[in-house]
Amino acid sequence: MCNVRTRHKQDNILTKKGQYTTMTLNDFLAYAATGKPLNTPDICSFMDEMSNEARRVTFRLNAEFHTQEEVRSLLSEIMGYTVPDTLRVFPPFYTDFGKNIHIGENVFINACCHFQDHGGVTLGDGCQIGHNVVFATLNHGIEPENRRFTYPAPIVLGRNVWVGSNSTILQGVTIGDNSVVAAGAVVTKDVPADTIVGGVPARVIKHI
């Protein structure tokens, strides 16, 4: 559990008016699950603290060689729970949060993947993730006056999903069991189970 005391007076639903706040990780995750903008001072301060913590540990992970057992230990520190013994990850690995990544059994993540997981990233059993894949669970407002606001939404991969190198999975996307994302795709919408998608934006190429 993370308890980060902010320096700002209350101006959101998580605390009482006029009081200083201590936001917990559970507070943040519950708020992010609503999809509301992450734009209050309390939330921004909490995100900064969590980003600093995640980057400190990922620096240790990426700075030198580690055995897979050591990699899993550091990832467990980043994610806040003991990751499965069947997880294999080739560093470098990047995240600016880390506490909302959920990984099943027999998952493989290749080098240089980026997890922006504030909205939640779930990888089902047997997923294979290629080089340089980006999971982006935050989006910005379209209107210029709202563009500084970020809005969270989860990304969910079912079982046995294969994501090719240099793909980007955007917020709110669910990819069904056994599907394949071709290299370089930008996935903006849900992917049905047992399909291959590719392109920018990604579209169904064939059924498996």
What spans do the regions from the language model cover?
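Terminal amphipathic alpha-helical/low-complexity segments used for targeting or macromolecular assembly
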Residues: 1-86, 202-205
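Flexible, glycine/small-residue-enriched loop-and-beta-strand segment within the central core
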Residues: 93-103, 108-174, 200-208
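Short alpha-helix at the nucleotide-sugar/activated-sugar donor binding site of glycosyltransferases
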Residues: 128, 179-180
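Short arginine-rich
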Residues: 137, 189-194
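A generic "structured core" feature
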Residues: 162, 180-182, 186, 194
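Extended beta-solenoid/beta-helix repeat architectures
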Residues: 173-176, 191
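Conserved active-site beta-strand element of glycosyltransferases/polysaccharide synthases
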Residues: 197
